[in-house]
């Protein structure tokens, strides 16, 4: 989740400075970090050098993570987190390769597990605050398969066909599928230029509204379960789309809910900042440093600032 991940950052030594800060830092002996014959290094000096935004972000994150752990530790299953890690290890070709990839991002296996646990706490928080019904999930999701004939964006492209040829081929495939829809998967495996889904008989899994090309989405959500579309043009090429029966809806429901919550937060960051504010109030959070409080309120808990940051920054770190 992009906006949440922007707040789940490694806490640097700058957070430790707050322990030495009162309402304002002065150059008194109590605020001296290092002394020498050449002069002292104070909390105020160091905070000025590091920057209050970074200190506020780090300290807020540390505090937030402690609160979330206290509130949701009994709801997060470590076994599921271990299963996530095992899945990632397989994707990277084994434990050693996975841990090497982590090291390249400055992470250890333990730190990565801690990050997954923190992300799980955030999911629990948002699940508490943002209610989504089963009917809403069904309304906003559709299980689908497709056959794609790619259109070349330029003549030198190795993949795809010219627009006219691609359309003609897609129309021929659509006629073949319409004669016997039960062969959709077999034909998708043979003809689709989307190699990822072609290996799975064209299966895309569940598609959410707002997740894909608008023309593709419009055509898909018009279909009844089991129906096959006419040829649909999108920014990728020409598709034949099949609406699959959601026989596994109950097992996929929680994952779909989390994705819909993420979409809602992306569209309306106030949902996230309000959830944080409620949490701070519940735990009687008191900012001892006025400057830190100002940064947290004006930037971190400001939905407009968070939205700008989410648009400019991407999700860093390894995929889950």
Swiss-Prot record:
GO terms of molecular function? peptidyl-prolyl cis-trans isomerase activity
According to Swiss-Prot or TrEMBL, what is its membrane topology? Lipid-anchor
What Gene3D superfamilies does the database record attribute to this sequence?
3.10.50.40, Porin chaperone SurA, peptide-binding domain (1.10.4030.10)
Keywords associated with the record = Cell membrane, Isomerase, Lipoprotein, Membrane, Palmitate, Rotamase, Signal
Region ranges (Disordered): 159-198
Principal localization?
Answer: membrane
Query: What's its EC?
Result: 5.2.1.8
Residue span, PpiC domain: 139-245
Give the residues carrying a lipid (N-palmitoyl cysteine). 21
Q: Where in the cell is it found?
A: Cell membrane
UniProt entry tagged with the keyword Membrane: yes
* Signal peptide interval: 1-20
Q: Name one GO biological process term.
A: protein folding
Matches recorded under InterPro entries = Foldase_PrsA, PPIase_dom_sf, PPIase_PpiC, PrsA_foldase, Trigger_fact/SurA_dom_sf
Q: Which PANTHER family match?
A: FOLDASE PROTEIN PRSA, PEPTIDYLPROLYL ISOMERASE
Family to which this protein belongs: Belongs to the PrsA family.
What role is this protein assigned? Plays a major role in protein secretion by helping the post-translocational extracellular folding of several secreted proteins.
Q: What is this protein called?
A: Foldase protein PrsA
Native source organism of the sequence: Staphylococcus aureus (strain Mu50 / ATCC 700699)
State which gene encodes it. prsA
